[in-house]
Amino acid sequence: MDKPVSFLTWDQVATQLTEAKHYWICSVRPPTLEAPGGRPHVVPRWCVYVDGKIYYDGSPETRHAINISSNPNVTVHLESGWEAVILEGTAKMADKPSPELGEKLSQAYKKYKEYGYTPGPHSWDEGGLFVFTPRQCIAWSKFNEDPTKFIFEIEQDS
């Protein structure tokens, strides 16, 4: 007898996103004089999941930042292949966060305290913050039993 198929809830996936410490971000390289564009670039990042978006910080001069400035389409996935969470969406340099968002980000980043990283609510006032907005998510904890796809409504920039 086959096992019944079940689905993950968004709360289960959101918990994984909130608790995860290692995220992988895959962007696409633009063309250069040395090489054609379209080559993937993957980098591990420390991220936080706040208000339905993934935030991470870094220099605008890094490879992934250069990539998203020309092509914002990005894939983000968590470390586990057994309890997979794979998101597709867009990333961009974030505006200065509001005081409320800065506080939420600072609180969320406390999960990295054991690694000596504890940014404060105003750490991104001068920039260096990126935001990833998911379009869809594929997740599973038991591949043949509960693969689940979520599709999100995208806010239009005004």
Identify what each model region corresponds to:
Residues V13, H64-N67, L101-A108:
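Amphipathic alpha-helical interface surfaces
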Residues W10, W24, W46-Y49, W140, ...:
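Tryptophan-centered motif/residue detector
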Residues M1-F7, E83-S158:
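Charged, gly/pro-rich active-site loop segments
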Residues A14-T15, W46, I66, G120-H122:
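Short secondary-structure boundary/capping segments
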Residues T15, G37, E79-G81, H122:
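Generic marker of residues within folded, mature protein domains
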Residues D2-W24:
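Short, basic/aromatic recognition patches
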Residues A20-P60, I66-I68, V74-L78, I86-T90:
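Short beta-strand segments
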Residues T9-Q12, H41-V43, E61, Y117-T118:
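A generic local structural motif
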